[in-house]
Regions:
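Hydrophobic h-region of N-terminal signal peptides that target proteins for export
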Residues: 9-17
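Carbohydrate-interacting regions of secretory-pathway proteins
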Residues: 19-227
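Positively charged n-region of N-terminal signal peptides that target proteins for export
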Residues: 1-5
Length: 227
């Protein structure tokens, strides 16, 4: 009897830990993605999506063809110095809003000395929602010229971010509950930056029982005040 109980307990523990992840990128082609707004190039190199900066074009976005509401998103990213980038979440592109310009929440990728990677920006809408002036200790989480691991939890009105396990941003906002995810190649104004790249790989999403797999609040960044 004791063995049966032990077996059941082990089974339950394993079930609780079995988080369902879905890859958003198959490592081979861009099936399930579409390019929006600008003309920067996206290509696949060594199993990663590589965005290539281009002069004379606005911000370019590679967006999922599916929309997502509540989710946990993880990915690895790497960016060349001199660029800026981000990952859109719960974002939209509508003909009647700024001629289809992509807008919505953005996980910031910022290799500059400002070091706001992991902050939350509202692309083409309200600008900064959570700059890292609200959480200065997170400014050292991002590593230049190296692969970094990101985690984003968007559950209900809560959006929280981490880089390399360090909590970065934490907001409550209800403007957009559902939208696509997109990889940004930011516009550049310096010809010397043309051809520089930002890379993403191991992109995966969990949309099942996300509340169950949320990180405890004690391990999140301080809440931002949007008022």
């Amino acid at each position: 009897m004791k063995n049966i109980v032990l077996t059941l307990l082990l089974f339950c523990a394993a079930s609780l830990g079995a988080q369902n992840w879905e890859p958003l990128f198959n490592g081979k082609n861009l099936k399930g993605w579409k390019k929006l707004n600008g003309k920067a190039e996206y290509k696949i190199v060594d199993g990663a999506i590589v965005g290539v900066s281009k002069m004379g074009t606005p911000n370019t976005f590679l967006a999922t063809t599916k929309n997502y509401g509540d989710f946990i998103l993880e990915f690895d990213f790497k960016i060349d110095d001199g660029l800026n980038s981000g990952v859109q979440l719960r974002s939209e592109s509508k003909k009647d809003y700024k001629k289809g310009r992509v807008h919505g929440y953005q996980f910031e990728i910022d290799p500059s000395k400002r070091a706001w990677s992991g902050g939350i920006y509202d692309e083409a809408r309200r600008n900064w929602l959570y700059p890292l002036t609200l959480n200065p200790s997170a400014k050292t989480a991002f590593k230049n010229n190296a692969w970094n691991k990101a985690r984003i939890e968007a559950v209900g009105n809560s959006i929280r971010t981490w880089i390399n396990g360090v909590p970065c941003a934490n907001i409550w906002d209800d403007m957009t509950p559902v939208g696509f995810i997109a990889l940004q190649v930011h516009a550049i104004g310096n010809a010397a930056d043309e051809g520089k790249t930002v890379r993403w790989k191991d992109i995966r999403i969990c949309t099942t029982d996300v509340e169950r797999y949320q990180t405890p609040e004690a391990q999140a960044a301080p809440e931002g005040d949007l008022c």
